[in-house]
Amino acid sequence: SKTLKHFNIDPKEAVLKRYSELNQMQWKLLEQGKISRDQVKLRRFQILFNELETNASAEEAALMYETLLAYGHYFMDGAEELLKTLYSKYRLFLVTNGTLSVQKGRLKSAGISRYFENIFISEELGYNKPSIEYFDCCFSKIPDFHKKTSVIIGDSLTSDIQGGINAGIRTIWFNPSHDKAVDIIPDYEFDSLRKLPELLSKI
């Protein structure tokens, strides 16, 4: 909303909802290999501004938004406690389709990098989830990696769960809104962060 206000656009609920829809659409296209990451950053604002019939610069908005994102983060209730618990029992790796500058900035400001043995950012690797190339690249950088003892945990069916399926590892879907999985089926799912340690201990 700060970015929209800067360009004198009222960040009312309908506008923010439409931006969210457009943003998700662009990331889906990236996952499908139809557009580039730079196009994701730009197109979400280009389409929104076109629909709002404003002359605001999509290029300037995209740059400003990325800068703000890099310094913004929030924890879900129990998130850092969960990381501490898992860190004491498992090897943790972070896999993300986010942009390099945003993800590194967020991780630094959140102070959670220490919990991960390695962090795999798609822009850095040159491949995106859910492609098998992305996961093959990640696996090649993990010492003593074994698919049978590995799982991917994520909230996106199309990038995290489909990616795990493509890569041949078990999948755990974080589904707090109790959505129904239809075409992409995870091996396990949970709806609350506090339930994850027990689930992991049973599989």
Enumerate the language-model features and the residues they cover.
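Asp-based, Mg2+/Mn2+-dependent phosphohydrolase catalytic module
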Residues: K84, L100-I203
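N-terminal helical cap/lid subdomain that shapes the substrate entry/recognition surface
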Residues: S1-D77
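Catalytic-core regions built around general acid/base machinery
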Residues: G78-K89
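Glycine-centered short loops/turns at secondary-structure junctions
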Residues: K89-Y90, G168
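Conserved phosphate-coupling serine/threonine residues in phosphotransfer and NTP-handling enzymes
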Residues: T96
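Conserved serine/cysteine hydrolase catalytic core
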Residues: F93
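Short, well-ordered coil loops that connect the C-terminus of an alpha-helix to the N-terminus
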Residues: I9, T54, S88, D144-F145
